[in-house]
Amino acid sequence: METVAAAITKNNGYESFCVTNAKNNNMKVNSADPLNWGVAAEAMKGSHLDEVKRMVEEYRKPVVRLGGETLTISQVAAIAAHDHGVKVELSESARAGVKASSDWVMESMNKGTDSYGVTTGFGATSHRRTKQGGALQKELIRFLNAGIFGNGTESSHTLPHTATRAAMLVRINTLLQGYSGIRFEILEAITKLINNNVTPCLLRGTITASGDLVPLSYIAGLLTGRPNSKAHGTSGEILNAKEAFQSAEINDGFFELQPKEGLALVNGTAVGSGLASIVLFEANILAVLSEVLSAIFAEVMQGKPEFTDHLTHKLKHHPGQIEAAAIMEHILDGSAYVKAAKKLHEMDPLQKPKQDRYALRTSPQWLGPLIEVIRFSTKSIEREINSVNDNPLIDVSRNKALHGGNFQGTPIGVSMDNTRLALASIGKLLFAQFSELVNDFYNNGLPSNLSASRNPSLDYGFKGSEIAMASYCSELQYLANPVTTHVQSAEQHNQDVNSLGLISSRKTYEAIEILQLMSSTFLIALCQAVDLRHLEENLKNSVKNIVSQVAKRTLTTGVNGELHPSRFCEKDLLRVVDREHVFAYIDDPCSATYPLMQKLRQVLVDHALVNGESEKNLNTSIFQKIATFEDELKTLLPKEVESTRAAYESGNPTVPNKINGCRSYPLYRFVRQELGTGLLTGEKVISPGEECDKLFTAICQGKIIDPLLQCLGDWNGAPLPIS
């Protein structure tokens, strides 16, 4: 009996979703796993992070070798994104199978066999008959060219360049399996279009039911030289069909379609699944990013790290949650922020909340199921891009054409709807965390709006960014509404149920872009918070030094040099500095209306009240020392605060930045050093949006991947032991 693991065949080092008979290249049923559930389960083994690392490694390879069974979403994303460099190679071993199905169609037609789409009309009009097979294919492409370019208008209704390249790759992969009845030379021509960066213009208008008929017909139109065909050249210029062929180095002229070939080109789900592949590559990266951002959020918010304890998550059983918690635990383990926060939490514990708010404390429980959804969708789309989606299917071994419905793109529509829901929920978490971060009622001492200027009345920090985040989140949540519940009966009620796969993919692509906007804004805010914690530590250090100096100078001795009762106040005065949030008073540290001076005075008053009879003696009265202490503090403290700020701004702070020794440092370094962003203040000209723009562009270009993975480079794939 063959095991499930053995059922996953290997090709070029990648797992195949098909089990093949090497002798005749026909599908066979695996007796150990006849329904493919075992193969699906096997594909989910290992951690999500390891899978993302494999995806990134695969994405960066210079060649994609197509054989019909081992295409991955990362390969699709690579071809889609890399206009130059990554090349497609076709497996020569597939040529014989492709030719056999093509020959079968011609022989069948010559014998007078009645076959759908070869001798019949299409869809609801399949009762019509013709013997003009080539003319029928030509008409198929003509009537499916029903899209609208919108020439002369501001809006363009062509699909993105990346989506078209992805669609061409996926369609080639499907056709290579030899069940479609098309010449190998046509697949080679499409490959040349990809490799020479010539991209047909595809239009909207598909319900992904009998495949993506309308957009795919524009690829067929270009291959056959239709006069309305357009393509983008290597520099983005618009080309007609003849120019496109010249640019792609296709030298044999336009194709005269043989029977079934037009149908083979258009009757597939490649546009929806191609775009879905691009979406899911990005979604997987954003999912890992959200885990690391949540950990950094816990660091700058001085959160309690016990929310990542493995026992909590082990008892919940969900693998996505367990992994999310373990990743956050890894980031927080040994973090200087966590160590400092622990000391703060031990100070007056009964006067502080026992636990953090949900956006921090339940982030693993929130993200875990979303990661599972994205991962399952990834595997579903990976199966789809390795599927044969034609109708009819040409079964050469049994000498028959099978009429079915593999063109129904339900796996795409459902996977994309689910992915969009997951993206919206990730966005909601980031927004909740962002809202806590900028609110001084919740953020454990950071300034309101993360303002960093000397004068908070002229610096409103991330207030505009919070409004933008609310806008992004609202739009993202609107997009989370399902597409697949909006099916309309089409094509004379023949296509009465249809998947809407491409529409759902397009909406999910929009959701990806919005989540990238949110992730960019949030990470810039987190870096601002990191720098503010650094500034806070330096300022507090300076305030403590000055308070200590002034206390020693003014409170230790009396007028005649004798030891004074007020000498015992210093410890309590420094405790006030430790307890007070620096940014609550630092813009005017000696103001009588701010908490620092009020509470320092209260310490002296409290000591005076217990000084008893000694207060009646001017030489031993603590009350008499208060004015002297405050006057000297007012003289020294503002100067020291300004000096500390100046040293910080010049890059010479007394206390180094804690982030430098943390596992989250690679992301911070990337944002600050590689992208050249800095601490935002109202005193500077640069706006928050300009800094967010730099990071957004970097995320879209994939530049954040390496620093993100570096944060987790030494994670062993397991939670810390329960101790």
From Swiss-Prot:
Tissue-specificity statement: Present at high levels in roots, with slightly higher amounts in roots with nodules than those without, and at moderate levels in stems. Low levels also present in lower leaves.
Protein residues bound to (E)-cinnamate: 267, 355, 361, 391, 463, 491, 494
GO cellular component terms, semicolon-separated: cytoplasm
Localization, UniProt: Cytoplasm
Recorded metabolic or biological pathway in which this protein acts: Phenylpropanoid metabolism; trans-cinnamate biosynthesis; trans-cinnamate from L-phenylalanine: step 1/1
Pfam families listed in its UniProt record: Lyase_aromatic
EC number(s) reported in the record: 4.3.1.24
GO molecular function per UniProt: phenylalanine ammonia-lyase activity
Protein origin, superkingdom: Eukaryota
Reactions mediated catalytically: L-phenylalanine = (E)-cinnamate + NH4(+)
Annotated catalytic residues: 116
Modified residues (2,3-didehydroalanine (Ser)): 210
UniProt PTM comment: Contains an active site 4-methylidene-imidazol-5-one (MIO), which is formed autocatalytically by cyclization and dehydration of residues Ala-Ser-Gly.
GO BP terms in the entry: cinnamic acid biosynthetic process; L-phenylalanine catabolic process
Record keywords, A-Z: Cytoplasm, Lyase, Phenylalanine catabolism, Phenylpropanoid metabolism
Gene3D superfamilies on file: Fumarase/aspartase (Central domain), Fumarase/aspartase (N-terminal domain), Phenylalanine ammonia-lyase 1, domain 3
Residues in cross-link 5-imidazolinone (Ala-Gly): 209-211
Family: Belongs to the PAL/histidase family.
Subunit structure, as described in the record: Homotetramer.
Function of the protein: This is a key enzyme of plant metabolism catalyzing the first reaction in the biosynthesis from L-phenylalanine of a wide variety of natural products based on the phenylpropane skeleton.
Stated name of the protein: Phenylalanine ammonia-lyase 1
Provenance organism: Pisum sativum (Garden pea)
